[in-house]
Amino acid sequence: MSTWTSKIAIVALLSGCATSIPAPDRADLRIEGQVVSIVAPAGFCVDPQSVDVTKAGGFVLFSDCALTGAAGGTVSTAVISASVAPTGLNGTLVELQKFLTTEPGKITLGRSGDMQAITVVESRVVDDVLLIKVDDRGAQPIRGVSPEIWRGFFVAGGRAVTATVSGAAEGGTSDIHARRYLGQLAASTRAANKT
């Protein structure tokens, strides 16, 4: 095997070790040498094509298990994404909440990038999870998605995790369900990362 093909094989092998999906509802992401397990709420499964790890952190997308080909679950139009930072949270959840509800902070919560179109509808810390409901009436980068989303911020395995629940523009996801999904994801993820 030539030197350049050996290097390609090594890179492919190493990149393959960055993620694994040990169960339909779980993705293990190796970030900066540490594995962080992200566990979906009941009825949601990993979209295997979505799992990604870079120097900036990790990402995974969960949707209804019936849509990903796995058995079980009730039909839901919600999609849940989770991003894991390579570091922990700088400061407290209350400090993060204060920043994200300011004009400059709002821009990071929406999708449109239009600060004037983004409104923080609700914000609270429950069970060590910062929950924020966002209404973004700007141009959406993804067609067919509701302008209302819920974001959850928490720490698991020493890493900052940001989770988002999005629903379809028609029908959407109720606030109760969105908060429940974020709470379940945070609790399951924390439990999976206890050392």
Residue ranges of model-derived segments:
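A mature extracytoplasmic/lumenal domain signature
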Residues: 40-42, 50-52, 86-88, 134-138, ...
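Short, surface-exposed beta-strand/loop micro-motifs that present aromatic residues
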Residues: 147-155
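Post-signal-peptide N-terminal segment of Sec-exported extracytoplasmic proteins
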Residues: 34-65
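C-terminal motif of bacterial Sec signal peptides marking the signal peptidase cleavage site
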Residues: 13-16
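Surface-exposed amphipathic alpha-helical segments
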Residues: 160-195
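Bacterial N-terminal signal peptides that target proteins for export
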Residues: 1-9
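Bacterial signal peptide processing site
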Residues: 18-21
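Conserved polar/disulfide-associated segments of primarily extracytoplasmic proteins
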Residues: 58-144
